[in-house]
Amino acid sequence: MQGPRERMVVSAALLIRERGAHATAISDVLQHSGAPRGSAYHYFPGGRTQLLCEAVDYAGEHVAAMINEAEGGLELLDALIDKYRQQLLSTDFRAGCPIAAVSVEAGDEQDRERMAPVIARAAAVFDRWSDLTAQRFIADGIPPDRAHELAVLATSTLEGAILLARVRRDLTPLDLVHRQLRNLLLAELPERSR
């Protein structure tokens, strides 16, 4: 069972994926997590910024674990598409990727300085996902330079499809990206890896 601190981090990640970081207040996290009111600054002396950073790290680790568990690039693509497909359907298209939600807010002049550590964490998560994905593609026999290009392409395209699916309240963008990335990977894989 998770303690109050862990529940707060998970709750923050869940709220960010639906509302974004700016609209996720500590009071909302406390209510969502069921943590005691005075616990926020006890567990997060760095305040809301620390909580948001840890929520980004948590969400990043969740997807990184999926990437590491995948047998290969095609299985990884299928697993990620399925994860976001189920997430979008189960939340009536309210929940996207919390890392993307934080990143979209990077240009906000009002909070740029305060949000800088959170944005830096989000950038590091995207880089890590791309690196781990490239390693999957390399293990499948795709040359390293091409594997890194495909990993950035896959990450970027998937994030865009999630955003479009949310806005349109329709899975078509996700399905299209799934089909096209799958075809691209199949064309790139050596015969023995297909």
Swiss-Prot record:
Family annotation (SUPFAM superfamilies): Homeodomain-like, Tetracyclin repressor-like, C-terminal domain
One example GO MF annotation: DNA binding
Keyword Transcription regulation: yes
DNA-binding region in chain numbering: 25-44
Pfam families: TetR_C_13_2, TetR_N
Domain of life: Bacteria
Keyword Cell membrane assigned: no
Residue ranges occupied by any HTH tetR-type domain in the UniProt entry: 2-62
UniProt keyword terms in alphabetical order: DNA-binding, Transcription, Transcription regulation
InterPro entries xref list: Homeodomain-like_sf, HTH_TetR, Tet_transcr_reg_TetR-rel_C_sf, YxaF_TetR_C
Signal peptide range in chain numbering: none
Note: Was identified as a high-confidence drug target.
Protein name listed in UniProt: Uncharacterized HTH-type transcriptional regulator Rv0196
Gene source species: Mycobacterium tuberculosis (strain ATCC 25618 / H37Rv)
